[in-house]
Amino acid sequence: MAILGIEGFNRLTERQRMHLLYEVCSSPIWARRVLAGGPFRDADALFDRAERVLAELPDSALDAALDGHPRIGARADNASSAQEQARVASADDSVKAELAEKNRAYEERFGYVYLVCASGRTAEELLAILTDRLGNDPDTERRVMRSELGKINRLRLDRLLSKETA
């Protein structure tokens, strides 16, 4: 077994790289634009490209990226989300219920799923962040959400480059 690394990523076919990038962020526009910046000299070049593309992504493409993220506390439908939200699964039922209630309030207020880099955070921490962010105005929240998506993408890209290959 070997680690994929940036060299291995660059050697993959365009289709394979596109598929992997889409697993990181479910915006086809983001994945295509990141891919267009390759081959990458090192992991930092990939991370920088991913961050720049996200910053320039139109809101419609950003909304498409959110479709790949389950609600915090809901059953994750992909391995990345499940791993990132692992500490929520063991939370007290009352905390999970409050998360569900505030998730719905967030979606009603802002029109999209509450997105936060959940990796390593407890359900209680995520609930406190959600409660705080419900007080944001829509423009501020959009910026915060975009920043959180960037953190998630970076975490997933790092994990992608570190995964073992056959």
Give the positions of each predicted feature.
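Aromatic-anchored, charged helix-turn/loop surface patch used as a conserved interaction hotspot
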Residues: 1-106, 151-166
